[in-house]
């Protein structure tokens, strides 16, 4: 059984008041780096970080060091995602991996190395992070969302990022896990359940735009996933208790027609710098007016 968590974990710590919620979104997750920089420059620091998929990566780095310098380090990590081989290689190489594994196209080893290189030395477990941190993955055996609040940090982040078909399911304990976005893509409800009263939602821009009717067969899956993730987020927002304030931070621009094949371009890291800058400017302006 994997090391689990519930809302009573870390009870020796005071209840959080300010949470950063970092959603999933593949290559579009670079937007969250700009948002983090704007938040930290404004003096807004979290006492709880929860993340899903690529948001688990960004969240782990900021939970390890909630400073502007950490946001700048994250920008370097995102530059590395395009060069590290996480989603690179020839079509022949990907077919070789698929033939051996029969379940996925890429090895998770490059992503593991990149994470280990960008996390502080000596921070191996979630409990060692200065800011309480949780990330979510989807348990295959239990068909349920699973929250990691303790245990090996990199393993938990890899589990949250295990995109079906691209990366192998990650085994932690006796369970196997897939990408947390399958279960809870923008986990506002988790932050509120843990006691947060002010929640900053860092998302990649999709929920800012209406969905489009699919035009091509492969767009149907993208639209279906968007409906599921937006429904969960809308339900969390509708269930907010009195006194909880939620800030949905702006991404700074369109991400393309929602529900199209472009949404599935998981290797499109070439625009990371532009996405970071755009989200930074939009979020800084939002915070100045808040």
Segments and roles (model prediction):
Residues 1-52, 60-290:
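Patatin-like phospholipase
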